Design a protein with these regions (language model features):
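Extended soluble regions of mature proteins
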Residues: 1-167
Length: 167
């Protein structure tokens, strides 16, 4: 069988197109004895170390689909809630409905710069550290002024913490 790969296509600041291709990985879960309720479904607790984070997930065997948010999957039921141990990321199902239409995910065919995960995270880190500098650095003839709610020029927003989902 061929090796399965996951391709992430991303666009930073509506201008920098990134492509990160990696081998597919699955979390190795430990199912615990605790139970809770999410959206009125009886859920069981599971934990794992995955992509540099410790995850806690609540899944329901009432919906026997081994899927969940982001790349969290592989449990004997749908993951309805998941969060990392540092509180940086949290996913909670807000509702479910039956879809009767098919909506394909379309690729626009535009060129994306290929890179590994480390380089991908570096681009995002640069953007979060100085969003305006990231944009104007890519377009030398563009200047940008950030204004407050009263129309007064303010300092460029900087130092937004960047905590990548995958480390």
């Amino acid at each position: 069988y061929p090796t399965v790969k996951v391709t992430t296509l991303d666009e930073v600041a509506c201008m920098t197109r990134l492509r990160c291709e990696e081998a597919e990985e699955h979390p190795q879960w430990k199912i615990l004895a605790e139970n809770d309720s999410v959206l009125s479904y009886l859920c069981s607790k599971a934990e794992c170390q995955f992509k540099g984070r410790t995850w806690t997930a609540w899944f329901t065997a009432e919906i026997p689909v081994s899927e969940g948010p982001w790349k969290l999957c592989g449990l004997p039921g749908l993951i309805l809630k998941a969060e990392d141990s540092e509180g940086h990321y949290s996913f909670t199902a807000a509702g479910m409905e039956q879809c009767h239409t098919y909506r394909p995910i379309l690729f626009d065919g535009k060129k994306h710069e290929p890179m590994n995960r480390k380089a991908y995270n570096k681009v995002h880190e640069r953007y979060y550290a100085d969003p305006v500098g990231f944009i104007t650095g890519s377009m030398p003839n563009v200047t940008d002024t950030i204004k407050d709610e009263h129309g007064n020029a303010t300092k460029n927003p900087k130092n937004v913490p960047y905590t990548p989902l995958e480390r």
